[in-house]
Amino acid sequence: LTALFEHERAACAQDVVAAQDLTVFVLRDDCDTHELQTIARKMISERFTIVDEVALDTTARSRVMSQTRGGNWIEKYRPEPVQPIIAIICRDAAEQGPLPIAMSAAKLAKRYPHLKKTDVLMKRVIRDHINLVAPLAHDRVVLHATDNPLETVETLRAIFGEDASAFLAI
């Protein structure tokens, strides 16, 4: 498995360099109204510059669900998988803001071992806020976000397929 991982990393090394300052947020279909999506976008834009937004077609949804780490696409409260619906591609801030959640450095390292930039933890603040303003019988996960440049490349490849490298070259 390690050899396969290293082979894939080498194959996308140029794209990883191009993705150093990018983060991708993927809204899920449990962020199910225009109002909730607007809240998520606004909160994302407090820490990131949104550079593109892509409504995911069936093929991209399937690739995102099967080819990316995380996302929690299977939820116990519903029989069918949660679908990724919108990708929000962002440029990271030049300087990371204060840690958006209360967590010790040790717990942060244990819970998010691949995390490169702490601003991405805004996803937890966004989830909490949406669950507060639009409560259900269960908590919504609402969105997924990439933790590092390699995950960003993997997610962009799932979204754009063979055109991911061309997107990164822009």
Enumerate the language-model features and the residues they cover.
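Non-catalytic terminal and connector segments of soluble metabolic enzymes
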Residues: L1-I170
